[in-house]
Amino acid sequence: MKSVRSFIRNDILAMSAYKITDVPPGFAKLDAMESPAHPFEGHEALMREWRAQLASAPIHLYPNPSGCGLQEALRSAFDIPDCAAVALGNGSDELIQFITMLTAKPGAAMLAAEPGFIMYRHNAALYGMDYVGVPLNGDFTLNLPAVLEAVRKHRPALTFIAYPNNPTGVCFTRAEIEAAIEASDGIVVVDEAYGAFNGDSFLPQAGRIPNLIVLRTLSKIGFAGLRIGYATGCPEVIGELQKILPPYNMNQLSLTTAKLALQHYGIISANIDSLKNERERMFAELGKICRLNAFPSQANFITIRVPDADLLFDTLKQNRILVKKLHGAHPLLEHCLRITIGSSAQNDAVLDVIRRLYR
C-alpha cells in the first residue's frame, strides 16, 4: 500500500513550514512588528462603541467584504484615487499568494530584492514560478543597476518591492522604485506593509500606472489580529485578482472592527506617531553603543548588527524579551537581529540589556 505522503507534491514535501514562536507569559514580544498595546486603549467611549458593534455584528451571515463599507472607509482614510480599484484580503499574505497565482504562467519569473519578505520566494515556489533574488547592497540599499539588469534579462511577470523593506527597515528611494516600474513589462507590487511609518507612498499613483499594484495592511498599525490587507491598482488588473479571491475570505468581526477604526483614524494616527517617536529615540540611543550597528529604519522596527547575534538573542530572552534573530537567514544578515518598536518601558528594557552586554 502506498504511503499517503506519496500523493503530496514533492516540492511541498521538501519545504519547511513557517514557525510561529511560542511566547511565554510575561515576555515582551518584540519579534513580529506588532503594536505594543490595544489600539483603542485609553479611549473608553470608543471601546464601548466597539464592543457594542461586535455584539450586534451579524455573525450568523456570511460576510460581504465588498459591500460592508470597508472599501469606502479605506478610500477616505488613505486618499485612494477614484480611478483605482480595491481588493480586500485576509491579511496582505493572502493577497501576495493570489497575486502570485494570478501571474504564475508556465515559465514565468518573479523578481524581488534580498534579503526581503520570505513569503515572496515561498509563493513563487508554491506556484512554480522561477524566482530571481537580487541582493541588496551591503548597507541594505537597493542595487538598482542589478535590479534593472535582472528585469532586462529575466522579464519577470511579477516583481515585489517592499517599501520600506522587511527585514531591514531601510527605505529605497522613490526614484529607484519608479525606475523599476518603468523598466518592467510585468506587474510590479509595491508592498507598503510598513508604509504608515514612512513619509511617502505610491497610493496616489494606484490606478494611474497600468502595471502597478500597491499592497497595504492594517496589521502594523495595531490590528495584526484582524488580518486585513488590501491591494489597489488599475481595475483591469484588480478585477482579474478578484476573480480568484475566495468569496468569503474575511470575517464579520474583523470587518466591523476595521471599519470602526478607520472612522476614528485620528486615534490610530496618534498611535503611529508615538511609535515613530520611539523609533527615533531607540535609533539615537542604539547609535551611542559601541560594537553595534543600527540601520536606519522607516518601519516599526530597527535591525541591528552585533558581534554575536546568538549571545544577544539569548541574553534578551533570559531577560524575558523576545526579538527576531535574522542571523543565518541570508548572508547579508550575518549577526543581525530585528527589534520591534514597543512601548517606552519595553524599549528601555531592551536598551538596558544591550548596554550591559556591550558596555
UniProtKB/Swiss-Prot annotation:
<feature type="modified residue" description="N6-(pyridoxal phosphate)lysine">
    <location>
        <position position="220"/>
    </location>
</feature>
<comment type="similarity">
    <text>Belongs to the class-II pyridoxal-phosphate-dependent aminotransferase family. Histidinol-phosphate aminotransferase subfamily.</text>
</comment>
<keyword id="KW-0028">Amino-acid biosynthesis</keyword>
<keyword id="KW-0808">Transferase</keyword>
<keyword id="KW-0663">Pyridoxal phosphate</keyword>
<comment type="subunit">
    <text>Homodimer.</text>
</comment>
<protein>
    <recommendedName>
        <fullName>Histidinol-phosphate aminotransferase</fullName>
        <ecNumber>2.6.1.9</ecNumber>
    </recommendedName>
</protein>
<keyword id="KW-0032">Aminotransferase</keyword>
<dbReference type="Pfam" id="PF00155">
    <property type="entry name" value="Aminotran_1_2"/>
</dbReference>
<dbReference type="InterPro" id="IPR015424">
    <property type="entry name" value="PyrdxlP-dep_Trfase"/>
</dbReference>
<dbReference type="InterPro" id="IPR015422">
    <property type="entry name" value="PyrdxlP-dep_Trfase_small"/>
</dbReference>
<dbReference type="GO" id="GO:0004400">
    <property type="term" value="F:histidinol-phosphate transaminase activity"/>
</dbReference>
<dbReference type="InterPro" id="IPR005861">
    <property type="entry name" value="HisP_aminotrans"/>
</dbReference>
<dbReference type="InterPro" id="IPR015421">
    <property type="entry name" value="PyrdxlP-dep_Trfase_major"/>
</dbReference>
<dbReference type="InterPro" id="IPR004839">
    <property type="entry name" value="Aminotransferase_I/II_large"/>
</dbReference>
<dbReference type="GO" id="GO:0030170">
    <property type="term" value="F:pyridoxal phosphate binding"/>
</dbReference>
<dbReference type="GO" id="GO:0000105">
    <property type="term" value="P:L-histidine biosynthetic process"/>
</dbReference>
<keyword id="KW-0368">Histidine biosynthesis</keyword>
<comment type="pathway">
    <text>Amino-acid biosynthesis; L-histidine biosynthesis; L-histidine from 5-phospho-alpha-D-ribose 1-diphosphate: step 7/9.</text>
</comment>
